[in-house]
Amino acid sequence: MANTITPTPHQLSLPLPLYTAEKIATFTDSRGESFDIMLGADESIVQQLRKKSLDTTDTDLQDNTSDFKRFGGGSYEEWYSKGRTPFALVHQASVALAAFAWFGPKPLGRKSLKYLSEAELKEELNQKEKTWHTLVYRSYLPYRGKGLMGDFIRFAIAEYRKHYPEAKLWVGGNADNAASMGLAERLGFKRRDDLFDAEKNWMAMVQE
């Protein structure tokens, strides 16, 4: 049995107000487990996001993301103010956050917080970009590695492009994060060797 996604009719426009989440689809995985795909993030989702970002036992998350600083120690409101559009995958029975993704304007090749210098961090809120939009995604235990992310992110991309059809998407991260970069490749992203940072082992991939 393959994953199936059943869209929920809606007429939402972006950006959504802060702490707003609307169901846009039902996701049923290959084992028959049901999830809600949410556009936006309400306070319940953000609370889970913060808790998971602070979980130091999740070494994959801590080693490969800036979420401990971004969501655990930082302001969600400030992050959202940068034009971010979040999507959440929420397990229906337990209401647990299974995966989280976001899009938003960001200059091509601009690294995440984990890789920025102090001077670059001070400029983070002053970026002006319209053409290139970043895509970032996370999956959380115990749902990581269960075959959910490809279909979830593919659906999120299609939804986001309805609102921003001219946007060029890019992803970036640790070149050794085979799962994340492999997913990007399966989604049609292509590596940009000219943006590879050998010192920080950071790479970018684009989908134009």
Which stretches of residues belong to each language-model region?
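Solvent-exposed beta-strand sheet faces enriched in polar/charged residues
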Residues: 104, 170-172, 192
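GNAT-family acyltransferases
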Residues: 1-141, 197-208
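A short glycine-leucine-enriched loop at secondary-structure breakpoints
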Residues: 136, 145-152
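Short glycine-rich hinge loops at helix-strand junctions in the catalytic core
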Residues: 147, 164, 188
